[in-house]
Structure formats: structure tokens, C-alpha cells
């Protein structure tokens, strides 16, 4: 796939911004199990999945992994660039759930685009709201529903999705 097809705001960038993005974007093939972003230890940038699957999770105080959301083809992960956003104060780890190909817009490039391009700023706000909604749904499930109710819901989803 071409960069133009994967970057959601590509058509709304100026020619100069598009050229800088083409020159600075990183393309990586990552193996299953690879940690792509390790919380506050990294400030990776905006990650876009070209192929494969990623998982965003956090660790509880007792070391349990809590999956916040998954990312599939053409999904983007903003929390790997959370260091450029004020008031984002939680640890998110991004792991490849299968062999994957990802694009990364480096933090410095993405931060510049947020400040100079209204479409990129709007995309960022929309993505942040969407991911916040995902995280809140997970928290609601964990805090307000028993394990047996969550397991029953998961099993019914699996049953419905089978051919």
C-alpha cells in the first residue's frame, strides 16, 4: 500500500507537508511479540498499521496486562506520541500481536503538523476521542461487570462471528 492510502489526512496536507512526510516517515516490519512502544520510556510518534495487528495495553499495579484496544490495517495509534500532548499521564505499551508492517510518523514531524495543519489537529482530536471511548469501555467492563458476565459476552461474540 502507498503512504497516500494509509495516512488519513494525506489529501489535506500541502505539497510541502506531503514531501516532508514521505521523506521522514519510517516503515518497519515487526515480528509478533515485539514491543513497538514502551510507555513513557519512548516517544515514538504516530503509528499506522499497514498490515498485521497491534495491541495497546497497560499494566496494573500487580503486573496484570489490561488490553485497552487492538489496531488493525489502517488503524492509527496516537498514544505512542502522547509525550507531545499535555495532560496525558498514563502508560500505554504497544505490542505486535502478529507479524506486522507499521508506518511511524516521528514525533517531531507529527507535532509540527498538529500545529500547522488544521486537518491534522482535527484528526488528532477525533482519534483521541475514539481511543478514550475505547479505554472507557474497557474500564467499565472491568469495574462494573463480573468475570462470568464478560466471559459470556465474549463467547456469544465468538459464536456469532463464526461462519
Please state what every model-predicted region is.
Residues 68-126:
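Cyclic-nucleotide recognition modules
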Residues 1-32, 81-85:
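Cyclic nucleotide-binding regulatory module and flanking cytosolic helices
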Residues 25, 43-44:
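Short loop/turn microsegments at loop-to-beta-strand junctions
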Residues 115-161:
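Polybasic "coupling" helices that flank or enter modular domains
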Residues 61-68:
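Short alpha-helix-to-loop micro-motif enriched in aromatics/charged/Gly
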Residues 33, 44, 48-57, 73-74:
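Glycine- and acidic-residue-biased ligand/ion/polar-headgroup-sensing regions
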Residues 36-41:
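Short phosphate-coordinating micro-motif centered on Lys-Gly-acidic
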Amino acid at each position: 500500500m502507498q503512504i497516500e492510502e494509509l495516512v488519513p489526512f494525506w489529501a489535506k496536507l500541502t505539497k510541502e507537508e506531503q514531501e516532508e512526510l514521505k521523506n521522514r516517515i519510517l516503515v518497519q516490519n515487526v515480528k509478533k511479540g515485539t514491543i513497538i512502544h514502551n510507555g513513557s520510556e519512548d516517544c515514538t510518534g504516530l503509528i499506522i498499521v499497514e498490515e498485521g495487528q497491534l495491541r495497546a495495553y497497560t499494566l496494573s499495579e500487580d503486573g496484570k496486562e489490561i488490553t485497552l484496544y487492538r489496531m488493525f490495517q489502517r488503524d492509527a495509534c496516537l498514544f505512542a506520541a502522547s509525550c507531545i500532548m499535555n495532560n496525558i499521564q498514563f502508560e500505554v505499551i504497544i505490542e505486535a500481536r502478529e507479524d506486522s508492517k507499521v508506518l511511524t510518523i516521528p514525533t517531531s514531524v507529527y507535532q509540527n503538523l498538529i500545529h500547522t495543519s488544521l486537518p491534522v489537529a482535527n484528526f488528532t482530536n477525533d482519534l483521541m476521542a475514539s481511543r478514550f471511548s475505547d479505554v472507557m469501555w474497557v474500564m467499565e467492563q472491568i469495574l462494573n461487570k463480573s468475570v462470568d458476565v464478560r466471559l459470556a459476552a465474549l463467547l456469544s461474540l465468538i459464536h456469532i462471528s463464526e461462519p
